[in-house]
Amino acid sequence: MEKTELIQKAKLAEQAERYDDMATCMKAVTEQGAELSNEERNLLSVAYKNVVGGRRSAWRVISSIEQKTDTSDKKLQLIKDYREKVESELRSICTTVLELLDKYLIANATNPESKVFYLKMKGDYFRYLAEVACGDDRKQTIDNSQGAYQEAFDISKKEMQPTHPIRLGLALNFSVFYYEILNNPELACTLAKTAFDEAIAELDTLNEDSYKDSTLIMQLLRDNLTLWTSDSAGEECDAAEGAEN
């Protein structure tokens, strides 16, 4: 299928909320090997975020049921098997995205904005793997996630305005990584607060095109800070990450 046709089909699939189809189309576009435009990059990101998002929330629900089920309950094995099925799907999706990132996207990125976008994506998908990993595998996955986020973070600080939505989105997700994966609320709050304060200080540099995106992510940073510094800090913080652009 021609690239233009694949993109048209991906947009149609998005409107129909058929994200698996959308992801298949954008995977095919990526595998053609050319650098993606901003629009194509966003289509790819939205597709896989929805595809993996369904599995992440399903995994959480099933895990919660599993933990509450008595060990003597005959249903426990069925629940465990189902969790492992969802886990397997989630791993497969993450592996596909990480392969696309390493083979095509990061290597082809010619500007800092794209590089940060893809490295952030790499951090995200290793983070999703870390959510379901255990033992040595989990440690390696966490290291991979942190390494990608840190590389993206260093480039973003050097090359992008503090109000840039990609830089803000990276700070949002990196802080969620510190809070949820490394269980380090102090570092999570420091990172989120610094990103928020730096953006506030330079509000006059806000690009009109990205005003809505930037202010939305700033609001999410503030919501997470409120949540993390309150006594009720808990599972729901990742909902903020889910609403990120």
Swiss-Prot record:
SMART domains: 14_3_3 (SM00101). The keyword Lipid biosynthesis does not apply. Adapter protein implicated in the regulation of a large spectrum of both general and specialized signaling pathways. Binds to a large number of partners, usually by recognition of a phosphoserine or phosphothreonine motif. Binding generally results in the modulation of the activity of the binding partner. Negatively regulates the kinase activity of PDPK1. It is found in: Cytoplasm. One of its GO terms (biological process) is substantia nigra development. There is a cross-link at residue 49 (Glycyl lysine isopeptide (Lys-Gly) (interchain with G-Cter in SUMO2)). This is 14-3-3 protein theta. Keywords: Acetylation, Cytoplasm, Isopeptide bond, Nitration, Phosphoprotein, Ubl conjugation. It comes from Homo sapiens (Human). Belongs to the 14-3-3 family.
